[in-house]
């Protein structure tokens, strides 16, 4: 149904933990890639990073381990979300790294570790915005409202 909704010009907002990690089958992973325009990168996994020396254009490869953090930048804002158990609010203890896939998809929010916290997609057919942590876990209420308004503006403009 979501595929059909997207093909008819839908606007999709998904926030929460486990968006990527719960999608295990080939069909589910194809849905992430084909419709939500993202791929899941497990926290703690090793990736190859390529550094280019601007002076002589030499390329050096190194292994990096990717992580999330409770500090996020995006939509012109910097904010934190609850990521540890506490008495005020439930915590997003398993935020996810979601990477953009294909044309017109991009990192819309970034953890301060440099990994992607949200993927936005805008085509002539439909739009989507997928977060790797729950929107409602953003600590500051006015910031949470600003983030939601920014997402809604992206989805509807």
What does each model-identified segment do?
Residues 49-127, 132, 136-139:
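Catalytic beta-strand/loop cores that center a nucleophilic Ser/Cys/Thr
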Residues 1-85:
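A glycine-rich, often tryptophan-bearing local segment used as a flexible ligand/cofactor-contacting loop or short
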